[in-house]
Amino acid sequence: MSLEELETRVRKLSMRATDAKMNLHDLAEELPVDWEKIPETAEATFAVFKELTAARRALKAAKKAAEEA
């Protein structure tokens, strides 16, 4: 994946992570309504942040490799 593609991926994942975080926040604010949705919302939030962290690491490594080249 090119540096530009990695940067685009990180930006998109960052937006998804922000949306997931807000969904979890909104759910928490409305408790006890929809408390059954906590596991699925938390799992989705965890998954997107895990993916974002991996993409950020890949981008950082790619930038470092580009600097050394």
Language-model segments: residues:
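Short, charge-rich amphipathic interface segments used for partner binding and complex assembly
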Residues: 29-65
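Short, charged, intrinsically disordered terminal tails
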Residues: 3-5, 60-69
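N-terminal acidic leader/helix
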Residues: 1-29
